[in-house]
Amino acid sequence: MNILQNLKDSDPVISNFINSEKNRQETHLELIASENFASIAVMQAQGSVLTNKYAEGLPQKRYYGGCEFVDEIEELAINRAKKLFNANWANVQPHSGAQANAAVFLSLLKPGDTIMGMDLSHGGHLTHGSPVNMSGKWFNAVHYGVNKETSELNFDEIREIALETKPKLIICGYSAYPRTIDFESFRNIADEVGAFLMADIAHIAGLVASKLHPNPIPYCDVVTTTTHKTLRGPRGGLILCKDAEFGKKFDKSVFPGTQGGPLEHIIAAKAVAFGEALQPDFVNYSQQVIKNAKVLASTLINRGINIVSGGTDNHIVLLDLRSINMTGKIADLLVSEVNITANKNTVPFDPESPFVTSGLRLGTAALTTRGFNENAFEEVGEIIADRLLNPNDSLIESQCKERVLSLCNSFPLYEGKLEASIK
């Protein structure tokens, strides 16, 4: 084995698969709400020699030698994260959002304690108390949902559930909720019942960082997030607190509580992404993400397709396909046939199973990174509507795919610079 070989020479099979995935990303419209395109700089950091370094512990408090440079990098990542979110404490080591949530649970809860989060079928997340997840197996999970008429949070109902169940922890922040979250109202409810309040802002972190969505830091005891999605970094997790002393308890819950060695190459990539998000043009990007989502939603509404809650305040557009007598499973297949990548998703009060669903979840973060503007997203909406409203028309299917490829050619991914960056 020669460690100096390039990937294409060392393992051509894997190299070919990576190239195939690169081609898929270039020739498809990426509308999965939890995905984005990381910068070349972020990918260079996570593909660096830092992958070789073990660094258990925290900066300046390691269990291994040779950590002087990764200490500098991790401290920079911490400081940038704190500045970005106006927090007084941060841990950048969680491998994922799920790991970040697990560390919070380990710090604040004991098995059997009651936690309260949004029902998964209403837009919650597996790690917020779903019975198939550790959070629903180890804790007594109770759930709140949205109003049946508006599909928005009903704080009177949330308060009633909290008063009745007395949760130890209340979780806000969601995977399929397109409206602004009122963190102050959650704080008031948490204080009334003596609960900790955690915000999981995995989907909206980039919008929060850009001050286009209220910041949960002033209201929540702890905030978790992923570092990809709207934040446009590497796949990873992050924990934040306004109270530095309170935050320190989560350090031990990350290591050694739920993880071993941190991934210093990913932490470097997080630092790069945080640095990018601190630049003024990232705010412009985030503003465009929201503008594009609003145009996408209104275009679909004008074509007779219902949108959950009637629109969006963030990057998520959730289609309720019952309005056109279609399931999410079928819609997902139909758009995939014309090179559009999305995902079937439950909608509030969904009569279908999670394997079928009545919804299709779309997100605008990735294509906005690619340069799509309102005009382009109006065309995206028209293509989706044409495909869904004419599922058996092969001519329209062919035309939709041609229009998708035309858009992809108009907004090239990485502008052809990716090959040069990885040689």
UniProtKB/Swiss-Prot annotation:
UniProt xrefs under Gene3D superfamilies: Aspartate Aminotransferase, domain 1, Type I PLP-dependent aspartate aminotransferase-like (Major domain)
Major enzyme class: transferase
Modification N6-(pyridoxal phosphate)lysine occurs at: K229
BP GO terms, sorted: glycine biosynthetic process from serine; tetrahydrofolate interconversion
NAD among keywords: no
GO CC, one annotated term: cytosol
SUPFAM superfamilies, alphabetized: PLP-dependent transferases (SSF53383)
The protein's Enzyme Commission number: 2.1.2.1
Localization terms from the record: Cytoplasm
Keyword entries, A-Z: Amino-acid biosynthesis, Cytoplasm, One-carbon metabolism, Pyridoxal phosphate, Transferase
CDD domains (UniProt xref): SHMT
Residues flagged as site, Plays an important role in substrate specificity: H228
This protein's pathway: One-carbon metabolism; tetrahydrofolate interconversion; Amino-acid biosynthesis; glycine biosynthesis; glycine from L-serine: step 1/1
Any one Gene Ontology molecular-function term assigned to this protein's record: glycine hydroxymethyltransferase activity
Cofactor(s) the protein requires to work: pyridoxal 5'-phosphate
Sites where the protein binds (6S)-5,6,7,8-tetrahydrofolate: L120, G124, H125, L126, S353, P354, F355
Pfam families: SHMT (PF00464)
Primary location class: cytoplasm
Complex and partners: Homodimer.
Family: Belongs to the SHMT family.
Role summary: Catalyzes the reversible interconversion of serine and glycine with tetrahydrofolate (THF) serving as the one-carbon carrier. This reaction serves as the major source of one-carbon groups required for the biosynthesis of purines, thymidylate, methionine, and other important biomolecules. Also exhibits THF-independent aldolase activity toward beta-hydroxyamino acids, producing glycine and aldehydes, via a retro-aldol mechanism.
Protein name, UniProt field: Serine hydroxymethyltransferase
UniProt source species: Prochlorococcus marinus (strain MIT 9215)
Gene from which this protein is expressed: glyA
